[in-house]
Protein backbone atom coordinates (compact mmCIF):
# COMPACT_ATOMS: atom_id res chain seq x y z
CA UNK A 1 0.00 0.00 0.00
CA UNK A 2 1.08 3.56 -0.62
CA UNK A 3 0.17 7.01 0.56
CA UNK A 4 -2.63 9.29 -0.55
CA UNK A 5 -2.64 13.09 -0.64
CA UNK A 6 -6.08 14.46 0.17
CA UNK A 7 -7.22 18.06 -0.11
CA UNK A 8 -10.08 18.76 2.30
CA UNK A 9 -12.30 21.87 2.42
CA UNK A 10 -13.56 22.91 5.84
CA UNK A 11 -16.37 25.46 5.96
CA UNK A 12 -16.70 27.55 9.14
CA UNK A 13 -20.13 28.14 10.69
CA UNK A 14 -20.10 31.87 9.92
CA UNK A 15 -18.10 34.89 8.84
CA UNK A 16 -17.56 35.70 12.53
CA UNK A 17 -15.71 32.41 13.16
CA UNK A 18 -12.11 33.11 14.23
CA UNK A 19 -10.14 31.32 11.50
CA UNK A 20 -6.82 31.44 13.37
CA UNK A 21 -8.43 29.68 16.32
CA UNK A 22 -10.20 27.23 14.01
CA UNK A 23 -6.89 26.36 12.32
CA UNK A 24 -5.36 25.51 15.71
CA UNK A 25 -8.35 23.34 16.60
CA UNK A 26 -8.07 21.53 13.25
CA UNK A 27 -4.35 20.89 13.75
CA UNK A 28 -5.06 19.50 17.22
CA UNK A 29 -7.46 16.81 15.95
CA UNK A 30 -5.50 15.50 12.95
CA UNK A 31 -5.45 11.71 13.44
CA UNK A 32 -2.16 9.97 14.25
CA UNK A 33 -2.22 8.13 10.90
CA UNK A 34 -2.38 11.42 8.95
CA UNK A 35 0.22 14.14 8.40
CA UNK A 36 -0.48 17.78 7.59
CA UNK A 37 1.19 18.68 4.30
CA UNK A 38 2.01 22.39 4.16
CA UNK A 39 -0.06 25.10 5.78
CA UNK A 40 -3.80 25.34 6.24
CA UNK A 41 -4.85 27.80 3.54
CA UNK A 42 -7.76 30.26 3.61
CA UNK A 43 -9.86 30.28 0.42
CA UNK A 44 -12.31 33.16 -0.17
CA UNK A 45 -15.83 31.92 -0.92
CA UNK A 46 -18.22 34.90 -1.00
CA UNK A 47 -19.25 37.97 1.02
CA UNK A 48 -16.29 37.68 3.40
CA UNK A 49 -16.74 33.97 4.09
CA UNK A 50 -13.54 31.92 3.81
CA UNK A 51 -13.05 28.16 3.78
CA UNK A 52 -10.00 26.39 5.16
CA UNK A 53 -8.15 24.05 2.82
CA UNK A 54 -6.20 21.27 4.53
CA UNK A 55 -3.89 18.90 2.66
CA UNK A 56 -3.18 15.63 4.43
CA UNK A 57 -1.03 12.63 3.64
CA UNK A 58 -2.76 9.43 4.74
CA UNK A 59 -2.03 5.74 4.30
CA UNK A 60 -3.89 4.08 1.43
CA UNK A 61 -5.91 1.73 3.60
CA UNK A 62 -9.59 1.14 4.20
CA UNK A 63 -11.21 4.25 5.63
CA UNK A 64 -8.62 6.58 4.10
CA UNK A 65 -9.64 10.12 4.99
CA UNK A 66 -12.72 9.19 7.04
CA UNK A 67 -11.05 9.48 10.47
CA UNK A 68 -9.82 12.99 9.59
CA UNK A 69 -13.17 14.03 8.11
CA UNK A 70 -15.02 12.84 11.21
CA UNK A 71 -12.55 14.56 13.56
CA UNK A 72 -12.78 17.85 11.64
CA UNK A 73 -16.60 17.72 11.57
CA UNK A 74 -16.70 17.47 15.39
CA UNK A 75 -14.65 20.66 15.89
CA UNK A 76 -16.63 23.57 17.30
CA UNK A 77 -17.07 26.22 14.60
CA UNK A 78 -17.05 23.79 11.65
CA UNK A 79 -20.17 23.73 9.47
CA UNK A 80 -19.13 21.29 6.73
CA UNK A 81 -16.21 19.07 5.66
CA UNK A 82 -15.67 17.99 2.04
CA UNK A 83 -12.88 16.06 0.31
CA UNK A 84 -11.98 18.03 -2.83
CA UNK A 85 -9.22 15.80 -4.21
CA UNK A 86 -7.50 12.55 -3.32
CA UNK A 87 -4.70 10.92 -5.27
CA UNK A 88 -1.92 8.41 -4.75
CA UNK A 89 1.60 9.66 -4.30
UniProtKB/Swiss-Prot annotation:
Promotes the exchange of GDP for GTP in EF-1-alpha/GDP, thus allowing the regeneration of EF-1-alpha/GTP that could then be used to form the ternary complex EF-1-alpha/GTP/AAtRNA. Keywords: Elongation factor, Protein biosynthesis. Disulfide bonds: none annotated. The keyword DNA damage does not apply. The keyword Protein biosynthesis applies. Belongs to the EF-1-beta/EF-1-delta family. GO terms for molecular function: translation elongation factor activity. This is Elongation factor 1-beta. InterPro entries: eEF-1beta-like_sf, EF1B_bsu/dsu_GNE, Transl_elong_EF1B/ribsomal_bS6, Transl_elong_EF1B_B_arc.
Amino acid sequence: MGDVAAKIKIMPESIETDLAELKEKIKAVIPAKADLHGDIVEEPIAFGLKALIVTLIVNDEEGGTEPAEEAFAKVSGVENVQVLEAYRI
